[in-house]
C-alpha cells in the first residue's frame, strides 16, 4: 500500500501548516502531512507488516518516537507498506480534537491467527548536541531577545523489530532501519545596546609582581557528548493512537 498524499494543494484539501524547507521551518500548504504517514508507519510496524519504502525526517520529530517517523514530500520520498498476511486488512483513521490539541488515531484491522505481538527496540548510537547562535539586531529594543529558529538535537538511531509469542518468548529480532537526524542550532536575535558607560582612567596603582603561586588545574576527564545510549525496547505506545500536534 503506497501512502498517497500529494499533490499538496488547497484544492486537494490541504491547509497551510509548519513544514521543513531547506532546513527551515516555514508555513506551507500540506505542512504536517508527515504526521499521518509517521503514525501509519508505526501502526504497520506494530501490526508486523512488511515495510517497502520509508525515509526518516531530516530532524527528529516531537510527535513520535525516534526511528518511528516516515517523511513524505511532493516528488518523493514516499512511504509504502505491504500486506504480507494471508488475509485482507483494513486501515482506519480518526481525527479528533481536545481543547487546543489535535489527535490522529490509525488502526489496522486484520485476522488474528495467533497471540504473537511486536516490540520495537530503539538503539541510539550517537547524540549530536546543538549550539546557540546570538545575532545582534537593530529591529529589537536593546537587550530584548527573540528566538528566530528553534533547536533540534541530532541522533543516529537503529531500530529492530522484535516479535514475541503470546507467552513472552522472543521469536525473532530483525533489523528494521537506520535513521540519521541532523542537529539544528538555536538562533536568538538580541537587540543591540545603544548606551556606553564612560570609564574613568583615574590613577593606576602599580602592583607588586612578587611571587606568583601556580595553581594546579587538576585533571579533567574528557566527556564524550556522542556516547551511545543503552537500547530501549518499546511496546505499542500510547502516542501511536494519539499523534501529537507538531511540525513536519
Regions found by a protein language model. Give the residues of each.
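Well-ordered beta-sheet/strand-loop patches within structured domains
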Residues: 1-248
